[in-house]
């Protein structure tokens, strides 16, 4: 690209999908960018189901995305040419009334961190699983679907290398890349960092990986169930809290108790689409219950230790989860939990989509973390989305709609 200073101004919609504009200026000064208010009214398939509530009363007047001079991320190397920008910035959204937008979950996560002592010291790592899809006359050269079959990456090496180069150029620190349980299923593990930064990295990494894949004639998808006969893709979250060395068990127990609250009350935030519910019927390294183990991969929660620091892995979120909303609810759960809490007997997870929507709407945890208006709007959107999902005649038809956005 030219040497012109251009900033890609982004914001996450209600589903954690990147929306934005390329602005012809640098990111050293504050900027406000207008967008149609209808963007937050859309379900995951793109239907404006909340348009009468969020856009029509205001004549579809603009929402505004505000970026401060501290929000910019300078881009380097491959990322600059890929995105056509010298910097990237994620802004805060105000609705047409000038108020913080109720479905800006990034802002809600930031607010929780600001008002809650100690949560900022939490560190979160993430593992992003995804599929690459494309026509390839060399498919006969691919190995069978075995985890860590690194020889299989050779067919996609240029695309995957460009993904990693772009992540480097955007300042997104990754730890490792591996093949997952299926041919053309991969995982990128992101380094531990603070909660808001990690949510931003997940958000940006998804957009970057999809953009890179498209430049190679491939589709990178983070939908949860790409095929009913193939392993689902997940978003594993590794959470560690401040630990002074006095009681390692108490630290991990508080994290796990908080996660258990989310599984019981706000499973919708971890498995947010009807497509993601098909994972219940696929044998994979995940659990259908709210169980916990010491290192075991077949449980929903997995207690681990790294460099003397206890952490807990939440293995349940599917790859389509909104990172801001999922991390927000995990932190809210930790905030309400205590190390002295008794960990209850495991219960089966309720994969019924309608039940999850009702549970979220009635959740004390969700209403402690989010304004009532936000909870009601999100539940309403998901109910409309469930109705739209039922209109797809086949799994493949719904999958096709999701591939366009996730």
Model-derived regions, located:
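ATP/Mg2+-dependent ligation/transfer catalytic cores
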Residues: 1-179, 348-406
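C-terminal accessory/tail domains of diverse enzymes
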Residues: 3, 8-19, 30-34, 38-41, ...
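Broad gene-expression machinery/nucleic-acid interaction feature
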Residues: 6, 18, 86-90, 125-129, ...
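Short, ordered beta-strand-loop transition motifs
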Residues: 81-84, 179-182, 303-309
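Helix-rich catalytic cores of soluble enzyme domains
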Residues: 117, 129-227, 231-245
């Amino acid at each position: 690209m030219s040497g012109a200073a251009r900033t890609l101004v982004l914001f996450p919609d209600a589903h954690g999908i990147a929306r934005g504009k390329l602005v012809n200026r640098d990111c050293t000064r504050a900027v406000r960018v207008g967008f149609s208010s209808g963007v937050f009214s859309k379900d995951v398939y793109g239907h404006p189901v909340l348009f009468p509530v969020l856009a029509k009363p205001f004549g579809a007047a603009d929402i505004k995305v505000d970026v401060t001079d501290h929000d910019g991320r300078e881009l380097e190397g491959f990322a600059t040419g890929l995105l056509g920008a010298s910097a990237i910035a994620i802004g805060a959204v105000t609705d047409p009334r000038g108020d913080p937008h109720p479905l800006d979950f990034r802002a809600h996560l930031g607010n929780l961190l600001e008002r809650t002592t100690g949560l900022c010291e939490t560190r979160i790592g993430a593992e992003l699983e995804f599929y690459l899809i494309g026509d390839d006359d060399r498919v006969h050269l691919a190995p069978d679907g075995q985890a860590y079959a690194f020889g299989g990456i050779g067919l996609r090496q240029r695309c995957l290398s460009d993904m990693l180069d772009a992540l480097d150029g955007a300042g997104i620190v990754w730890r490792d890349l591996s093949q997952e349980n299926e041919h053309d299923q991969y995982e990128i593990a992101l380094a531990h960092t603070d909660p808001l930064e990690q949510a931003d990295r997940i958000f940006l990494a998804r957009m970057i990986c999809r953009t890179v894949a498209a430049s190679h004639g491939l589709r990178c998808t983070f939908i949860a169930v790409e095929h009913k006969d193939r392993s689902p893709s997940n978003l594993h979250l590794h959470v560690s809290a401040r630990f002074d060395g006095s009681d390692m068990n108490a630290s991990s127990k508080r994290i796990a108790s908080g996660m258990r609250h989310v599984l019981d009350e706000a499973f919708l935030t971890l498995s947010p689409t009807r497509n993601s519910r098909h994972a219940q019927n696929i044998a994979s390294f995940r659990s259908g219950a709210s169980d916990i183990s010491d290192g075991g991969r077949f449980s929903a929660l997995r207690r681990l230790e790294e460099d003397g620091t206890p952490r807990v892995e939440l293995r349940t979120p599917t790859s389509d989860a909104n990172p801001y909303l999922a991390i927000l609810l995990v932190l809210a759960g930790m905030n309400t939990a205590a190390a002295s809490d008794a960990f209850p007997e495991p219960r089966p997870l309720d994969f019924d989509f309608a039940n999850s929507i009702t549970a979220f709407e009635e959740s004390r945890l969700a209403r402690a973390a989010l304004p009532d208006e936000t909870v009601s709007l999100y539940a309403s959107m998901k109910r409309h989305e469930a109705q739209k999902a039922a209109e797809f005649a086949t799994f493949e038809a719904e999958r096709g709609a999701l591939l366009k956005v996730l």
